[in-house]
Amino acid sequence: MASPEILAPQPPPPPQPRYTVFRGPNGIRAGWRVLIFLALVAGIGLTIGLLVGVIVALRGSAGARPSFGVSGLTPLGLSLSEGSLLLLTAVAAWIMSLIEHRPWGDYGLPVRSAFGKDFWIGTFGGFLAISASLAGIFLFRGFRITGVATHGSTLAMAIAAWTGTFILVGLAEEFAFRGYLQYTLTAGIGFWPAAILTSLLFGVAHAGNPGESKAGLLSVVLFGLLFCFFLRRTGNLWWAVGFHAGWDWGQTFFYGVSDSGIPPYHNFLNSAFRGPQWLTGGTVGPEASVFTPVVLVIVAVLFSRFYRENRYLMPTSAARPQVSDLKPQTFDLGPQA
C-alpha cells in the first residue's frame, strides 16, 4: 500500500510590506529623499549666511560688499562660490547617509579612489578635448593665439591657483548634480531618466551666466550626459571630476578664452576669435561653438571603447521572499499497515 504523505503544519505567511506615498521598497521614496536633501542644503546655506551676516555686522561693515579689484573670472572668487557649493552638498549628503545607513562614498566620491588613475586620465582627456575644439575652430580660421599673458613668478602662482580652483570646480559641480541627486533619482526612476533630469538641471544652473546662449546651454546639457556616462562606466565620479577640471583649466587658464561669457584673469595665453558665432561661440566662448558637441560625441565613442563594462552599482532594495516561493514541506512516515 502506498505510503501517504502528511503535510506538516505551515507557519502563517509573513506579513506583506505596507507601502505608502512616503515609503516604498527602499524605505523613504526617492522623491522625498531628494526634497529632504535639498531642504538640508538650503537650511545649511541659510544658517551659514546668517552667521556670516552677524559677523560682518558686528565688525561694523554690514553694508560692505567684497571687492577683489578686478572684473572677470578669478581663482579667489570662483573658489569661494564653488567651495561653498561643495560644503553645502557634502554636509547634506553626509546627513542623508546617516539617515539611509549608507557609506558616504556610495554617492559618487569614494575616498579610496580619490585622485587616482581615473582622475588623472580624465584630467588629461578634458584638456585634450578643449584643445581639439579650439583646433577645429583654428582650422576654419576662427581662432588664433596672440601671445603670452603671464610670466615669471606670477605665472607660477597662477598655475597653482587655477589648478586648485578647477579641481574644486570639478568636485563641487559633479557632486552637486551627479552625486547624491543622481544616486537617489536612479533608485526611483532608473539611471538614464535620472541622468537626463540632472543634466537639464545642470543646464538651468548655467542659464544665469552672463552672455550665455542657447547653443552654450545645449553644450552644458551634453556635458552633463557625458559626465553621467563616465559615472555609469567607471562606477564613481572621479573620471568626470578630472575631465571637468581639465576642460575648464585648459579653456580658462591655458588658452585664456571666455567661459560662459566671463573673461579670465591671470591666464597663460592671450587668444582671439574671428568669424561667425556658430564657429567661434561668440561672446560665450568655445563651449557655444559647433565643434564642442562634435568633440563631446567623439569623446563618448572613444571612452566607450576603453571602458566597456558598466560599473555603477544600481541602488536596489533587499530581496524579499514571496509567498509563492514558500513551498509546503512534506514528511514521509514510511510504510503504513
Question: What positions do the PLM features span?
Answer:
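Functionally important transmembrane alpha-helices
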Residues: 216-277
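Small-polar-interrupted transmembrane alpha-helices in polytopic inner-membrane proteins
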Residues: 130-131, 162, 166-167, 190-207, ...
